[in-house]
Amino acid sequence: MSKPVYVLGGPNLNLLGTREPEIYGRDTLEDIHARLRALAGDVAIVARQTNSEGELVSWVQEAARDGRALILNAAAYTHTSIALHDALKTLKIPLIEVHLSNPAAREAFRHVNYVAPVAVGTIAGLGAYGYELALSAALRLSGEARS
């Protein structure tokens, strides 16, 4: 059985669809995860969201052990979590960072990024579609490219 792609989300992503839809869009996290599962074919998707930094770090460690790739929207932890950065540095699998909005075009405090330096790439500002692009990259980089 092939290893899954992990799709992990940080704080407040459980509010997608209702929280600042003019910035984050109207898709819920469940909508996004359902689309990824449909696009992944026979590759399993492990999709989780948490508002807890420690839990997110534990899931990154699990993905490092059990996953083929990691798609991560760390949300606000992108800008604050050295613990998350340190966990991500241990990955031997591709890490694709995703943001629904473009943090570089927003408030100055969002310009600090502890995830990007350890990611293969970052997709930002494309809304929910960014997750689909991230899945395509994750599959290609982990050897499961779709034609």
From Swiss-Prot:
InterPro entries: DHquinase_II, DHquinase_II_sf. The keyword rRNA-binding does not apply. Pathway: Metabolic intermediate biosynthesis; chorismate biosynthesis; chorismate from D-erythrose 4-phosphate and phosphoenolpyruvate: step 3/7. Disulfide bonds: none annotated. It comes from the Bacteria. Catalyzes a trans-dehydration via an enolate intermediate. NCBIfam families: aroQ (TIGR01088), PRK05395.1-2 (NF003805), PRK05395.1-3 (NF003806), PRK05395.1-4 (NF003807). This is 3-dehydroquinate dehydratase.
